């Protein structure tokens, strides 16, 4: 019985630690909502095992507004570096905003199993 309690406590600690870390990411920090912050809107389609476009280029310091439409089936959009993971229902458009604060390449993927080609449903955001 003591062994089970130790495992439960260890698991709870791991889960709490993980939740605390994910809270450090903010898709849109309060300062990024100021009027003088550059903005860029991008339309994205999620369809049968692909995102179109699958490469998105933005400038560092930009507030990015993604308008993502799932045109075929239910998908997900996960951009882990920015703490984003959203469900995309078929024929729905979801608005996702994030602040591209730091240069680099950040992968995104479908986070909702959508069929045999699911693992290849990926893309990247390039912050220049």
Enumerate the predicted regions with their spans:
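Extracellular/periplasmic metallocenter environments
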Residues: 19-31, 88-128
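Extracytoplasmic entry segments of secretory-pathway proteins
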Residues: 1-48
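Short linear sequence elements within intrinsically disordered, low-complexity coil regions
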Residues: 12, 30, 54-56, 82, ...
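Generic structural signal for short, solvent-exposed loop/turn connectors between secondary structure elements
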Residues: 3-4, 38, 79, 83-85, ...
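Beta-strand cores of secreted/periplasmic/IMS beta-sandwich domains, seen most often
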Residues: 37-43, 54-73, 92-102, 126-127
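Generic marker of residues within folded, mature protein domains
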Residues: 9, 34, 48, 56-58, ...
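Pre-active-site segment of Zn-dependent metallo-hydrolases
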Residues: 76
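N-terminal post-signal-peptidase region of extra-cytosolic proteins
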Residues: 46-54, 79-83, 91-95, 108-109
